[in-house]
Regions:
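Extracellular structured ligand-interaction cores
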Residues: 22-24, 61, 105, 114-116, ...
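Short, flexible beta-strand-to-coil junctions
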Residues: 30-34, 67-72, 124-126, 209-213, ...
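Sec-type signal peptide cleavage vicinity
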Residues: 1-247, 297-303, 308-324
């Protein structure tokens, strides 16, 4: 995913600032009739302007203009090279009234006739490893690499130079050191600012080589970036997203298998934790067998009225409550190994290793939470309003071998698809629900009798 955005971090720096860059500067004035009056030259050092002499003007109203030595003064017009590496500055005052014999103080805001752009490469949870920006340049956009301006800094025409930009240093800045976390962090590598013509709107090519999420990355593509506005800052972001699941580790952090280190994966993340105050969710790696209930009484137990459709069931995210809060009959099902085996076994699931304090209690997931697991592998999947509540196949865009590999590669010994009818804590009317990975591009879901023995995946919050 690629975006071009205003660079709010750099907006305060878009103007030349104080002090302005050292160098040679020239100041002239234009009277109300449009006649130019040459004035001062001087040097800027550490924000202090030292003129080469003094300047007297007849009384009148003038617009004052200041340019640095990167701007060529042709007498009746100005010329500036807008390619990377140049930094022309033009400052134009508001009209000033000069009354002799008094001194006049004129201030300038020095502006770039160029735009500034940074390139940023974004990853999540884990930073790009040892990125190398091999090159960054462009197809030459004809003519706009330089420009002619009138004496007040207004652009007149293109200067005939191609708008090729380069980033010779290849320097990339990481926003924060890598630290495994339970929160999905954003890591960025960013270039320094690059100056370019605001009319520059051709394709910009970049080549970045690195490793990320356990894969070698070599991205060499073109993107549209313009047109831009002069004296504005932009940031072009390229976002690298992980196509594989994130894993919950025993120490309460998440990440890819490639950076597991000494950590042990205990689950697949089905809902990311986006801030410290947020709550993430993961599913266990291994299936458990049990029945929803051992008494065939077909009661509404969770909430009254109970969901009546697949769509309503998919909106239920309360598996933890159905496991640990008293049901409508006043029973905490997590505490009932005989009557509610699935709830009890889910609540007592053991991932096989000690876990951190931020990992909560395991529970029997709701139907909606199970759909979140499906969406880990098919982000476009959503239940249909016309789906039957009775056992049926629904279409998804999932290769089941990929699902199985996601579990097996993390140490699971369970066969995840093709057979297990994974029980959920949600009821439709008075019947339990289930949802299962079945075959390529196919799920199998619906309602079942409450005494049906089947398998399920415990879930946990972190």
């Amino acid at each position: 995913e690629a975006t071009l955005e205003p660079d709010t971090a750099g907006c305060a720096q878009t103007r030349a600032g104080n002090p302005v860059p050292d160098g040679t500067y020239k100041i002239y004035a234009i009277d109300a009739g449009g006649t130019r009056h040459d004035g001062l030259t001087g040097t800027m050092t550490g924000g202090v302007f030292t003129p080469s002499g003094y300047w007297e003007l007849e009384a009148g109203t003038y617009t004052f203009v200041c340019i640095n030595n990167a701007v060529t003064d042709n007498g009746n017009e100005l010329y500036a090279n807008l390619n990377y590496g140049q930094m022309p500055l033009i400052g134009v005052s508001d009209p000033v009234t000069v009354t002799n014999p008094f001194d006049v103080f004129v201030s300038f805001v020095m502006r770039h006739p160029q735009a500034r752009i940074r390139y940023q490469f974004v990853s999540y949870t884990e930073p790009i490893e040892s990125p190398s920006l091999g090159w960054l340049n462009s197809d030459p956009t004809f003519g706009v690499g330089s420009a002619y301006f009138d004496l007040k800094g207004n652009r007149l025409r293109d200067g005939g130079t191609s708008a090729v930009i380069f980033y010779n240093s290849g320097v990339l800045h990481l926003n924060q050191p890598y630290q495994p976390s339970s929160v999905t962090k954003e890591y960025t590598y960013t270039t320094d600012y690059i100056l370019c013509s605001p009319e520059y709107n051709s394709m910009t090519y970049y080549a970045i080589t690195s490793n990320l999420y356990g894969r070698a990355v070599h991205s060499n593509k073109g993107v549209q970036v313009g047109p831009l506005q002069k004296n504005h800052s932009y940031i072009w972001k390229l976002k690298f997203k992980n196509k594989d699941p994130w894993y919950l580790y025993n120490d309460g952090t998440i990440g890819s298998l490639a950076k597991r280190g000494s950590r042990t994966p205990i689950g697949i993340v089905v809902k990311e934790k986006l801030s410290e105050s947020d709550q993430g969710t993961a599913c266990a790696l291994n299936l458990i067998y049990g029945s929803w209930k051992n008494v065939g009484d077909n009661l509404v137990e969770n909430v009254n009225p109970s969901p009546t459709s697949i769509i309503e069931a998919a909106a239920d995210m309360n598996g933890y409550n159905w496991t640990y809060q008293p049901n409508l009959q006043g029973v905490v099902r997590a505490n009932e190994p005989t009557t509610y085996p699935a709830f009890y076994k889910a609540a007592h699931y053991n991932p096989g290793v000690p876990t951190a304090s931020n990992i909560g209690q395991w529970y029997l997931p709701s139907y909606g939470e199970w759909i979140k697991l499906v969406q880990v592998f098919d982000k476009t999947y959503a239940p249909s309003a016309t789906e039957s509540i009775y056992p049926h196949h629904s279409t998804c865009n999932i290769t089941m071998a990929k699902v199985q590999s996601a579990f097996t590669n993390a140490g699971s010994t369970s066969t995840i698809y093709g057979g297990p009818l994974c029980l959920c804590s949600t009821e439709i009317n008075e019947s339990p629900t289930y949802c299962s990975f079945w075959a390529d591009n196919s799920l199998y879901s619906g309602i079942c009798w409450n005494t049906m023995g089947s398998q399920f995946l415990p879930f946990v919050h972190f």
